[in-house]
Amino acid sequence: MTELSKPLRRTLVGRVVSDKMQKTVTVLVERQVKHPVIGKYVGQSKKYHAHDEAGTYKMGDTVEIAESKPISRTKSWVVTRLVEASKGI
């Protein structure tokens, strides 16, 4: 019999741009995509709402988020780890 394995979850790395909600942070993920006709690399960005149970991540932190089952209407990502803490002034 074959062993059922857990499906791989997509992971993204981005910057926390808002931590004003309870147990939720907004993460901005920026990517470089090659334009199909011109061939030039163009910057694209997208914001994701990610679950932060303890509320430990602050604005400016670089975090890794992973896809999960839907937690709410707009939230289907979970913060998995801190990549780099924000540089406080």
Swiss-Prot record:
Superkingdom to which the source organism belongs: Bacteria
Gene3D superfamilies: Nucleic acid-binding proteins (2.40.50.140)
Gene Ontology CC entries for this record: cytosolic small ribosomal subunit
SUPFAM superfamilies hit by this protein: Nucleic acid-binding proteins
Record key words, sorted: Ribonucleoprotein, Ribosomal protein, RNA-binding, rRNA-binding
InterPro entries per UniProt: NA-bd_OB-fold, Ribosomal_uS17, Ribosomal_uS17_bact/chlr, Ribosomal_uS17_CS
GO molecular function, one term: structural constituent of ribosome
GO biological process, one term: translation
Subunit structure: Part of the 30S ribosomal subunit.
HAMAP family, A to Z: Ribosomal_uS17_B (MF_01345_B)
Function text: One of the primary rRNA binding proteins, it binds specifically to the 5'-end of 16S ribosomal RNA.
Family: Belongs to the universal ribosomal protein uS17 family.
NCBIfam families per record: PRK05610.1 (NF004123), uS17_bact (TIGR03635)
Record-given protein name: Small ribosomal subunit protein uS17
